[in-house]
UniProtKB/Swiss-Prot annotation:
Annotated Pfam families: Ribosomal_L16
Protein known as: Large ribosomal subunit protein uL16
Family as reported in the entry's similarity comment: Belongs to the universal ribosomal protein uL16 family.
InterPro entries per UniProt: Ribosomal_uL16, Ribosomal_uL16_bact-type, Ribosomal_uL16_CS, Ribosomal_uL16_dom, Ribosomal_uL16_sf
Gene Ontology CC entries for this record: cytosolic large ribosomal subunit
Keyword rRNA-binding assigned: yes
UniProt KW keywords: Ribonucleoprotein, Ribosomal protein, RNA-binding, rRNA-binding, tRNA-binding
CDD domains with a match to the protein in the record: Ribosomal_L16_L10e
Domain of life of the source: Bacteria
Gene3D superfamilies attached to this UniProt entry: Ribosomal protein L10e/L16
Length: 143
């Protein structure tokens, strides 16, 4: 499960998920990518489930890059606890994903195999996703 080694603050504000992704919106390492079409919090368990789904399908064929990391702690108070008495303790970690963010990259496999691996990974995530090729995003960026 992904989580930071050390953090400055154990509890953070919820923040805003408005707008598009300005960073991490290009395929940089691999040939193919999985792009988010909606804004959401992606938990470390969901990232791990998507990674396992991809690597099991491509077997030893290609290489997978995870381009999102869960930096944000989500707190929760125990069940049947009265309101007040401070903020709850950190329960799990999430990555804030905005539309346009490339979440996973893949290289070393054919396009058909990459498309199917990304489809399996997208089913593990709580948002709509799109399969992209490196050339497609470079053409859009050059306009």
């Amino acid at each position: 499960m992904l989580m930071p080694k050390r953090v400055k603050r154990r509890r953070v504000h919820r923040g805003s998920m408005a707008g598009q992704a300005h960073k991490g919106n290009k395929v940089t390492y691999g040939e193919f990518g999985l792009v988010a079409l909606e804004a959401s919090w992606i938990t470390s368990n969901q990232i791990e489930a998507a990674r396992i789904a991809m690597t099991r399908y491509i077997k030893r064929g290609g290489k997978v890059w995870i381009k999102i990391f869960p930096h944000k702690p989500v707190t929760r108070k125990p069940a049947e606890t009265r309101m007040g008495a401070g903020k709850g303790s950190p329960e799990y970690w999430v990555a804030v994903v905005k539309p346009g963010r490339v979440m996973f990259e893949l290289a070393g496999v054919s396009e058909d195999k990459a498309r199917e691996a990304m489809r399996l990974a997208a089913h593990k995530l709580p948002i709509k996703c799109k399969f992209v090729k490196k050339e497609d995003l470079e053409v859009k960026g050059g306009e």
